[in-house]
């Protein structure tokens, strides 16, 4: 027994039944295994942690070394082994959480120390102000800078404009002096009180939170600060942060002009960066900066950056036409290693975007530190956390692809849309001739392969015939529409604004023989859209998906041409409860193969809230106080409306790209201009419909709508039925004979109305109609006519559709329809008639399903 126990492992039996393997049993309680036996069992455990009874018996036969152990004992060994593995994982998880909590506790203690210093400074300034107020004579005679009442604010806003002698790239000592000054100023912002930071609402620390986010208050330019924990080593974090185009979506390019090593092991880089313009109404920005990377004595890594200007000294950077030079004030990243692995990151972004150079209505985009925080500071932290999460292996692969592939797709969609909005000449874009009065800008690119890139497969259209890319874009202001709500509606209700013919043209551009010009195929209609999710970010603020548009047609030719179409779509900023710099919906047609190197031609929408600047000086706050006293609709003050998260104004940017053949360029341009104008009108109509002021607390309840539009529609339905059939609708209840809407609502037969569009969507239903569709008035607009009809119903409608349009009505045979929940319902007969408005113009199509019942 002693020989069997040497180097072995003891396993407690689940029962005390006697066993024949006496050498492995210790007092009937433990079974001891030799190292060779444990090694054999571990090999099997690696292959199959939970073997079946047959597998365990086979194991005993295959391994003679296990022949003296009963199958029941081996079963107990595997049970205990699984328990040990589970305990090991749980212990590891708890250790990780404990390390995070310890690091977060250290972070909070440092934040507390910094806030205490800030409070002490404010108390001192407050006491000084009181002294000045009680001694006005001293305030008038003392002309020193400390006598200014707003000394604290003055101190914050004043940038020391110390003129240094001109220092160029040939003088490393001069650049090192600038770098050391930048490092000191950055550290005073990251861990000191050089900037008065105000924590953003909703950003609370915790082991799984993104970190502590704060924005500047009363300082020159706009600034944002973040500190958080990530499970990556400092060198990896630094590598990610330096690759700015991978996480900063507004970054067009970063060119490192010159690299100078320093004596302390660091590096100085001279960098030229270009950023995209957020809308078509503003010019893009560029930056000429010095970036300094160095290590600190405590093992931390610092990457700091600032613009090289006349006041700082240093060489002059490149000047690019059509760009406005903006300034980076001392900013950067402080990366500290954590005990047990991981890093603690401090991020400071401080810029002056020259807000006075843009139209006044757009200045909030350049004056809001919250927008800067969302676009840069939080984006950097989220990207690092996303990569750390992917590196842990906890994210399952979707569609057979690694997460990095989906990140690349998202970056390509976003970058392609930004390229379309900005239309840089060095990418091949040029303006098409216009009379100057157009609200829609048309640009063409005759070098599409340069724009698409050499890393993707060439488009067959560009390789077979001469052609290019045409972009139609526009921007407009919206009132009282939350960007998240609008973009979510555009995503979920594509049929409300999209033209199936244009979608078909875009999809055909992926094939060698595209349609000539869309606009002629209007009799067919597009079926429902199916959303196939692909990937999403860690906090679900952005997601990638494939949209399948099911194609159908009425005529024989359209059936041959129609086919399912696919869009790769990127959606972000649609959570109304989260703070976001913008809401965006970008999509590009793809084919069924969905190759990694497929060319993408993105189009889409971007909605940016125009929030008023909340961090201005005291004079601005006085104006804000006055405006807060203004009472808006419903008796609510404007301040209370803004505090509730409602966006009063936003700017919408639309850009649609189309490929074209050279001889059809003018035709495609006319189509694109007309289409974008129609989309803008649809979006404006949707914005009015979904504005919060129009959404009451009763929305979604099944009750007859009492709006004037509903009353008018009810009278049109009854009058049109009488005009076409020569008889009135047989009302099941005459109690409300004076109210056509009430009669229509209470009718026992299902009465449904759908739009006269290529893709008919339901616009109205009575109570019975909502019952048969198993939906509500709000969700009714999600349902298309195509979705509820079976094959026989579609054939009957297609054959009778010309009769409806000519004679005004028709009777359809009984059949079966499908509810939104997938349940089938039968009806004895259906009546379809054309609803005419007061001027006898076709308004919609009405259906009455007689004597319906669920099957």
Swiss-Prot record:
User: Which residues, as ranges, make up the DNA-binding region of this protein?
Assistant: 26-89
Pfam families referenced in this protein's UniProt entry, alphabetically: Homeodomain, MEKHLA, START
Keywords, sorted A to Z:
Coiled coil, DNA-binding, Homeobox, Nucleus, Transcription, Transcription regulation
Molecular-function GO terms, alphabetical: DNA binding; DNA-binding transcription factor activity; lipid binding
START domain span: 168-390
Q: Which InterPro entries does UniProt cross-reference here?
A: HD (IPR001356), HD-Zip_III (IPR044830), Homeodomain-like_sf (IPR009057), MEKHLA (IPR013978), START-like_dom_sf (IPR023393), START_lipid-bd_dom (IPR002913)
What positions belong to coiled-coil segments?
Answer: 84-126
According to its record, what are the GO cellular component terms? nucleus
Source organism, top-level taxon: Eukaryota
Give the span(s) annotated as Disordered.
1-21
Where located? Nucleus
Task: Let me know which tissues express this protein, per UniProt.
Answer: Expressed in seedlings, roots, stems, leaf sheaths and blades and panicles.
Q: What does this protein do?
A: Probable transcription factor.
What family is reported?
Belongs to the HD-ZIP homeobox family. Class III subfamily.
Q: What is this protein called?
A: Homeobox-leucine zipper protein HOX33
């Amino acid at each position: 027994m002693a020989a069997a126990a040497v180097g072995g492992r003891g396993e407690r039996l689940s029962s005390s039944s006697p066993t024949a393997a006496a050498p492995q049993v210790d007092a009937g309680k433990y079974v001891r295994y030799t190292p060779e036996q444990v090694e054999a069992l571990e090999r099997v455990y690696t292959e199959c942690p939970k073997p079946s009874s047959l597998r365990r018996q086979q194991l005993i036969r295959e391994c003679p070394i296990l022949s003296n152990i009963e199958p029941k004992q081996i079963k107990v060994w595997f049970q205990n082994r699984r328990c040990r593995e589970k305990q090991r994982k749980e212990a590891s998880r708890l250790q990780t959480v404990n390390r995070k909590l310890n690091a977060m506790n250290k972070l909070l203690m440092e934040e507390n120390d910094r806030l205490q210093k800030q409070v002490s400074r404010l108390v001192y300034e407050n006491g000084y102000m009181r002294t000045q107020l009680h001694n006005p004579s001293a305030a008038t005679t003392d002309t020193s800078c400390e006598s200014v009442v707003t000394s604290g604010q003055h101190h914050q806003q004043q940038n020391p404009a110390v003129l240094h002698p001109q220092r160029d790239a040939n003088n490393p000592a001069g650049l090192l002096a600038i770098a050391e000054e930048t490092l000191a100023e950055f550290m005073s912002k990251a861990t000191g009180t050089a900037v008065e930071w105000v924590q953003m609402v909703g950003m609370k620390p915790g082991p799984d939170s993104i970190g502590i986010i704060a924005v500047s208050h009363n300082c020159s330019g706009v600034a944002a600060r973040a500190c958080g924990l990530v499970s990556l080593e400092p060198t990896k974090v630094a590598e990610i942060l330096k690759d700015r185009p991978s996480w900063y979506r507004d970054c067009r390019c970063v060119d490192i002009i010159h690299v100078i090593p320093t004596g302390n092991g660091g590096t100085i880089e001279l960098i030229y960066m270009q950023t995209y313009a957020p809308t078509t109404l503003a010019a893009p920005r560029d930056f000429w900066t010095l970036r300094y990377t160095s290590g600190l004595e405590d093992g931390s890594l610092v990457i700091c950056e600032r613009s090289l200007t006349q006041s700082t000294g240093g060489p002059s950077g490149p000047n690019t036409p059509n760009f406005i030079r903006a300034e980076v004030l001392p900013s950067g990243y402080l990366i500290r290693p954590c005990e047990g692995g991981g890093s603690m990151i401090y991020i400071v972004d401080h810029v002056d975007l020259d807000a006075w150079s843009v139209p006044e209505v757009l200045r909030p985009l350049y004056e809001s530190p919250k927008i800067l925080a969302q676009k840069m500071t939080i984006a950097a932290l989220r990207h690092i956390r996303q990569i750390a999460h992917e590196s842990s292996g906890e994210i399952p692969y979707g569609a057979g692809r690694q997460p990095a592939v989906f990140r690349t797709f998202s970056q390509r969609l976003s970058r392609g849309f930004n390229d379309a909005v900005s239309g840089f000449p060095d990418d091949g874009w040029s303006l098409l001739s216009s009379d100057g009065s157009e609200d829609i800008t048309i640009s063409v690119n005759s070098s599409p392969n340069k724009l698409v890139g050499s890393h993707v497969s060439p488009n067959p259209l560009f390789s077979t015939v001469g052609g290019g890319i045409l972009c139609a874009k526009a921007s407009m202001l919206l009132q009282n529409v939350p960007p998240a709500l609008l973009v979510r509606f555009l995503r979920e209700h594509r049929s409300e604004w999209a033209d199936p013919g244009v979608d078909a043209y875009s999809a055909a551009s992926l094939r060698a023989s595209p349609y000539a010009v869309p606009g002629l195929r209007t009799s067919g209609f597009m079926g429902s859209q199916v959303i196939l999710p692909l990937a999403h970010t860690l906090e679900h603020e952005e997601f990638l998906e494939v949209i399948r548009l099911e194609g159908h047609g009425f005529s024989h030719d359209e059936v041959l041409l129609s086919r399912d179409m696919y869009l790769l779509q990127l959606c972000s900023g649609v959570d109304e409860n989260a703070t976001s710099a913008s809401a965006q919906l970008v999509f590009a047609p793809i084919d069924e193969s969905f190759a990694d190197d497929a060319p993408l031609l993105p189009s889409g929408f971007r909605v940016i809230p125009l929030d008023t600047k909340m961090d201005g000086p005291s004079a601005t706050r006085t104006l804000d106080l006055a405006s807060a006293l203004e009472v808006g609709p419903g008796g609510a003050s404007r301040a209370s409306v803004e505090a509730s998260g409602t966006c009063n104004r936003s700017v919408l940017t639309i850009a649609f790209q189309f490929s074209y053949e050279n001889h059809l360029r003018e035709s495609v341009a006319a189509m694109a201009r007309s289409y974008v104008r129609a989309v803008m009108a649809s979006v404006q109509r949707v914005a009015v419909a979904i504005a919060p002021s129009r959404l009451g607390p009763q929305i979604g309840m099944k009750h007859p709508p009492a709006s004037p539009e509903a009353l008018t529609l009810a009278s049109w339905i009854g009058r049109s039925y009488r005009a076409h059939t020569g008889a009135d609708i047989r009302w099941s209840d005459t109690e409300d004979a004076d109210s056509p809407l009430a009669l229509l609502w209470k009718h026992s037969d299902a009465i449904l109305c759908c739009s006269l569009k290529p893709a008919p969507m339901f616009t109205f239903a009575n109570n019975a109609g909502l019952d048969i569709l198993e939906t509500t008035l709000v969700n009714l607009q999600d349902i298309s006519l195509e979705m509820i009809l079976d094959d026989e119903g579609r054939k009957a409608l297609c054959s009778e559709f010309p009769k409806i349009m000519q004679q005004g009505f028709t009777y359809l045979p009984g059949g079966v329809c499908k509810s939104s929940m997938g349940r089938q319902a039968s009806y004895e007969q259906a009546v379809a008639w054309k609803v005419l408005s007061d001027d006898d113009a076709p308004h919609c199509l009405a259906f009455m399903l007689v004597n319906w019942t669920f099957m």
